[in-house]
Amino acid sequence: MKKSIFSKKLLVSFGSLVTLAAIPLIAISCGQTTDNLSQSQQPGSGTGSGSGTNTENGSNNGSGSGTTNSSGGTNQSGSASGNGSSNSSVSTPDGQHSNPSNPTTSDPKESNPSNPTTSDPKESNPSNPTTSDGQHSNPSNPTTSDPKESNPSNPTTSDGQHSNPSNPTTSDGQHSNPSNPTTSDGQHSNPSNPTTSDGQHSNPSNPTTSDGQHSNPSNPTTSDGQHSNPSNPTTSDGQNQNK
């Protein structure tokens, strides 16, 4: 009986010693675990680099990468990317080409650097922004209504084909009449008598002669229809001369 009691006491004391010896080991292991956790949670400092590209429509695309070094010896790496937008030319309504000088120019094909309000649809008119010439620019007379060729001297000339530099109100449709702007001669110009009603030939001496075919240089009131009567202006001889 005494031996069994003694052996039980030895086992109990040995077990307590083992337990007491295990407590510091458990404490040490717990302390190491806590220390490792605290080291992994510490913030670190790092360096990074990035690059970006700018596109024509105003969007900015960038990307970057970096490496973070913590105090516990742990290395972390990562990458980041971002998008942004910017507007450089907002007010220019030019659809195809940019107009650096006049943002309100409505020219759809080519820029007009001098006159932003020019309504010329094909070519720019640098001198006269209000010119209504549809094909060619008229640098001298902005209100000229000549549709084919510019008339630099007479902006109100109504000559449809050729310009009349001297008489802006001449109604000559084919040729210009430089001397008599009111001449109604339809085919040829009458330089001396602007009121002559001779339809085919000019009558240089008698502006009121009503001779339809030939001119009557001496008697302006002769009513001879075919031949001229140089001596008797009031003779009514229709075929022969009355001397």
UniProtKB/Swiss-Prot annotation:
Ranges for the Sequence repeats: 97-109, 110-122, 123-135, 136-148, 149-161, 162-174, 175-187, 188-200, 201-213, 214-226, 227-239
Topology versus the membrane: Lipid-anchor
Signal peptide: 1-29
Residues lipid-modified (N-palmitoyl cysteine): C30
UniProt region (Disordered), positions on chain: 34-243
Ranges of Polar residues composition bias in the record: 93-243
InterPro entries reported in the protein's UniProt record: VlpA-F-like_signal (IPR049890)
Positions of the UniProt region annotated as 11 X 13 AA tandem repeats: 97-239
Highest rank taxon of the organism: Bacteria
Lipidation (S-diacylglycerol cysteine): C30
Cellular compartments per GO CC: plasma membrane
Location(s) in or outside the cell: Cell membrane
Low complexity composition bias: residue spans: 52-92
Primary localisation category: membrane
Keywords: Cell membrane, Lipoprotein, Membrane, Palmitate, Repeat, Signal
Miscellaneous comment as given in the Swiss-Prot or TrEMBL entry: The numbers of repeats can vary and is one of the basis of the antigenic diversity.
Primary role: Responsible for the antigenic diversity for host adaptation. Expression in E.coli of a construct containing vlpD, vlpE, and vlpF yields antigenically distinguishable products corresponding to each gene.
Name of this chain's protein: Variant surface antigen E
Organism: Mesomycoplasma hyorhinis (Mycoplasma hyorhinis)
Origin organism lineage: Bacteria, Bacillati, Mycoplasmatota, Mycoplasmoidales, Metamycoplasmataceae
